[in-house]
């Protein structure tokens, strides 16, 4: 083989790992992440897997872009042997047959009824869907998409979740939810890893009496929940304060999984009231990427991939809310210098009076 190329092979197939696949440089060019583990894993999966599993990300409604917003997610999916693709349902008219999962990541515009029919047909055939929804204000109302999720057992609230009981620093809309027990989350719980969901909307389970389905054919389980102190803010024009007349009281659910029995097959869904938790600058927070990748493994039946992944080196950044930034500014630029100035004046006066 060519210099710098590794080859893994069996008696029937072979896969090459190129030198450029072993390192992934940041856009600054200053730091390289070692991606050899993912590259060799991808090669081995290709050797021993008959059919590659494709993960399709929906486009056409202002969703997150794989190359720009979700490149770290794409890298992890590629590294674990998945094939990532984009699909515009308005042009294809259907979900591709080879799709193992269809990801709807933060749509800003609603789906047409024809697109909804295509997704429902995919689910009826035992497909898997991950719907990640931003709160109202970051996206338009999504009546068609919400109705489709409602038919699968999940209701979507038009609110912004505020949680004084568990949040990131001083940002009460940056929720760090409690993790419920499930195959997807059990290792997160064991390792005491949290997830961080900045600016979320709440979800709820549709009662069986509201829809005509057999309760035994569908199961809906919560994964992420707020504390009892949380509420779903519905008045976006004023400061966030709980109003029992219009706001949703806590605890609130931020993520569900749905399993729908379809005779010889199953449809599986992940619904999260947040799409930002997979953004490039947030996905490295503790358990965020593991939560999503474990969900992918659960939906595709790859139980061996449900684990805690090694972290790649990264620049540590501090994210400050407006209140935090003002606090840092006043303390470092005004309070501390003023304190030293007063101390100096006091020493000078004391020495002068001696």
PLM features per residue range, with description:
Residues 1-354:
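Short, surface-exposed patches at the edges or C-terminal ends of soluble domains, predominantly
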